[in-house]
Amino acid sequence: MTYFVVFLGLCFVLGGLAVASNPSPYYGVVGLVLASVAGCGWLLSLGVSFVSLVLFMVYLGGMLVVFVYSVSLAADPFPEAWGDWGVVGYGMSFIVVLVVGVVVGGFVEGWDFGVVTVDSAGVFFARLDFSGVAMFYSCGVGMFLVAGWGLLLTLFVVLELVRGLSRGAIRAV
């Protein structure tokens, strides 16, 4: 299990690297999906299943809309590739900053790493993410409706902006 968690952490860092050094919006989507899957899998391995599922739906539902919008506005006929020197330079600088942060953080913290799960207080302790689900659905109904309406409005605004002067996604029947 430890190797799997380390693998998920490595995938999360590589996904962040792919988002930070993307040469074009086409490749940013790949890095975002990799980072969100790895991060939510990491949370799932720590025992926070509901929060992991909600974050996964928010990342892939909300952020992919932003990337689709940016891809439609910045559609290059010849986009840069991963192997260009500028992209490799950004990637190497990201890795250098990451290694320096790990080394400095390790010296400051004394290399005291540990994993604490949500239900580490015992058998009779209520899990925090399950007790939060009831509050989320009982007190948050109005916020769900407002957020859903806002997302629907955002979708129509993005579709209207993308279509430009041509007859695009929203047409009068």
From Swiss-Prot:
GO terms for cellular component: mitochondrial membrane. Disulfide bonds: none annotated. The keyword Mitochondrion applies. Its EC number is 7.1.1.2. Gene3D superfamilies: NADH-ubiquinone/plastoquinone oxidoreductase chain 6, subunit NuoJ (1.20.120.1200). It catalyses: a ubiquinone + NADH + 5 H(+)(in) = a ubiquinol + NAD(+) + 4 H(+)(out). Its main location: mitochondrion. The chain crosses the membrane at residues 1-21, 27-47, 48-68, 87-107, 113-133, 139-159. It is found in: Mitochondrion membrane. It is a multi-pass membrane protein. Pfam families: Oxidored_q3. Belongs to the complex I subunit 6 family. Core subunit of the mitochondrial membrane respiratory chain NADH dehydrogenase (Complex I) that is believed to belong to the minimal assembly required for catalysis. Complex I functions in the transfer of electrons from NADH to the respiratory chain. The immediate electron acceptor for the enzyme is believed to be ubiquinone. This is NADH-ubiquinone oxidoreductase chain 6. It comes from Cepphus grylle. The lineage of its organism: Eukaryota, Metazoa, Chordata, Craniata, Vertebrata. The gene is MT-ND6.
